[in-house]
From Swiss-Prot:
One of its GO terms (biological process) is translation. The lineage of its organism: Bacteria, Bacillati, Bacillota, Bacilli, Lactobacillales. Its EC number is 3.5.1.88. This is Peptide deformylase. It holds the Pfam family Pep_deformylase. Disulfide bonds: none annotated. Its cofactor is Fe(2+). It comes from the Bacteria. Belongs to the polypeptide deformylase family. It comes from Lactobacillus helveticus (strain DPC 4571). Keywords: Hydrolase, Iron, Metal-binding, Protein biosynthesis. NCBIfam families: pept_deformyl. The active site is at E155.
Length: 184
């Protein structure tokens, strides 16, 4: 079971490196890693389990965040009522197209690897098309918009050595392009 002590924190070099692609079939180690990352997200969104194990709630977790420099990320995205609207483990994901129009979360973003609050809007594409493989090696291409697209972009950034605050406008953290969609 992944706990907060297992989450790599900002400053660790693995978070700033481009993760390596995985080859198929995945080894048992990487299959277990995918399971463990998803289990963390499920547990972190359950108030009783999260409190018992002192887990910070998360909607996404990338392999570099647990010290594994490989192209894998787990996503468990709820809607505003707590119902899961997107659940997947990406292996070797690639954003193949993105909208010109941007979106951001009204409250900004956070990250399990970043302990401090960093205020500001994090502009990301409003819509994404992502090509990836499942843990079983099935090739998929999906189109996402709004919150699932933002979470996917955040996690894929981790696989490319970027953190959310890299996208915040340093001079004007709450400045946005005119047609940016702000998601509450």
């Amino acid at each position: 079971m992944i706990l907060m002590k297992d989450i790599v924190r900002d400053g660790d070099p693995v978070l700033r490196q481009v993760a390596k692609p995985l080859t198929f079939p995945l080894s048992d180690h990487y299959k277990q890693l995918a399971e463990d990352m998803m289990e963390y997200l499920v547990n972190s969104q359950d108030p009783k389990i999260a409190e018992k194990h002192q887990l910070r709630a998360g909607v996404g977790l990338a392999a570099p965040q647990v010290g594994e420099g490989v192209q894998m990320a787990a996503l468990l995205v709820p809607d505003d009522k707590g119902e899961i609207i997107f659940k997947e483990v990406y292996v070797n994901p690639e954003i193949v197209s993105e909208s010109v129009r941007q979106a951001c979360l009204s409250e900004g973003e956070g990250c399990l690897s970043v302990d401090k609050v960093i205020n500001g809007y994090v502009p990301r594409p409003d819509k994404l098309t992502i090509h990836y493989y499942t843990v079983d090696g099935e090739e998929k291409t999906i189109r996402l918009k709004d919150y699932p697209a933002i979470v996917s972009s955040h996690e894929i950034d981790h696989l490319n050595g970027h953190l959310f605050y890299d996208r915040i406008n340093k001079k004007e953290p709450f400045a946005l392009k005119e047609d940016t969609v702000v998601i509450s």
